[in-house]
Each structure stands twice: as structure tokens, then as C-alpha cells.
């Protein structure tokens, strides 16, 4: 709650909560209506929106051919990113994803189209956010770097090769 409410409240942000049980359609409509600047979400919400609204449009033979053509694929990916951005309200800086593991297929897709997302890590028991990186410096498959004034220790016999 500290990261999702208090931080934004102290900085003068408007905070919107859904008044209905969320579904991909309700959430997508809320993004269109509210046009948020920052989106903080669990992976499942982002994955459902991508799988239901985006993947069906790009998983046909024509799109597969276009996405495998070197020069054309860049333009197609740019257009796909634009459409995905529109699906999230077209007004945000980045989407911060956390609370569970992020599906690798969806993460690879978002990275491929150069979508502004990042994955953070927090632990409700000790801190609202422990690791975070801006989407411009985020490394896919990671959960960012330790935030300022946070010390992180990996308690493992082999901290360099954690599975």
C-alpha cells in the first residue's frame, strides 16, 4: 500500500480504483477513460490483456511473415507497440509490474516491440519496493536494481548462479 498509495498521494497524484471486479475488458476500458501516467500491476493483468487483445491479432500467417522480414519487422513492431500503448491509455510513462513472476513469452514480446515496462520487486513485510529500474535501463528477466538507500543481500551458497 505504501508504494501504490502513499507515495502517489504525497506527490499530488490522482489514484483510481476500480469499483467492479476486474476483467481484461473492464481494465482496458478504465485505461481508456483514465489515461494513467504510471501503471502499477501484477503480471497476470498485463499478461491477460496482451494474450486477449494483442496475440490474436499478430498470430496469423500474414503477420508472421511480416515479423520475420528484417526491415519490415521493425516498422511492424513499432506499429504493434503503438497499438499496445493505446490499449493502456496512450498517456503513461511506463508500466511497473510486480508481485509475482512475469511470463517470459509476454516479457520477450514486450521487449521485442520496445514497450515501456519494467519489473520491480518488493516485500510487503519489510518494504514496499526493494528493486526497480526505469524501463530505459531495465534488463529483461531481472527485477531491477536495489533502490536508493536499500541494501540487498543474496543469501545463497552460489549467489552468482541462482536458478
Where are these regions (language model features)?
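Conserved AMP-binding/adenylate-forming
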Residues: 39, 76-163
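Conserved AMP-binding/adenylation subdomain of ANL enzymes
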Residues: 1-78, 82
Amino acid at each position: 500500500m505504501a508504494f501504490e498509495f502513499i507515495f502517489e498521494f504525497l506527490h499530488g497524484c490522482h489514484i483510481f480504483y476500480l469499483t467492479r471486479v476486474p476483467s481484461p475488458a473492464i481494465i482496458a476500458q478504465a485505461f481508456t477513460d483514465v489515461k494513467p501516467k504510471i501503471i502499477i500491476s501484477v503480471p497476470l493483468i498485463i499478461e491477460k490483456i496482451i494474450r486477449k487483445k494483442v496475440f490474436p491479432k499478430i498470430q496469423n500467417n500474414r503477420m508472421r511473415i511480416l515479423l520475420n522480414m528484417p526491415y519490415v519487422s521493425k516498422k511492424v513492431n513499432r506499429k504493434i507497440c503503438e497499438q499496445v500503448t493505446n490499449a493502456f491509455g496512450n498517456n503513461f510513462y511506463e508500466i511497473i509490474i510486480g508481485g509475482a513472476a512475469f511470463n517470459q513469452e509476454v516479457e520477450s514480446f514486450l521487449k521485442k516491440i520496445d514497450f515501456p515496462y519494467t519489473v520491480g520487486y518488493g516485500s510487503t513485510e519489510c518494504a514496499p519496493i526493494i528493486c526497480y529500474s526505469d524501463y530505459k535501463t531495465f534488463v529483461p528477466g531481472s527485477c531491477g536494481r536495489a533502490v536508493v538507500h536499500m541494501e540487498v543481500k543474496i543469501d545463497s551458497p552460489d549467489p552468482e548462479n541462482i536458478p
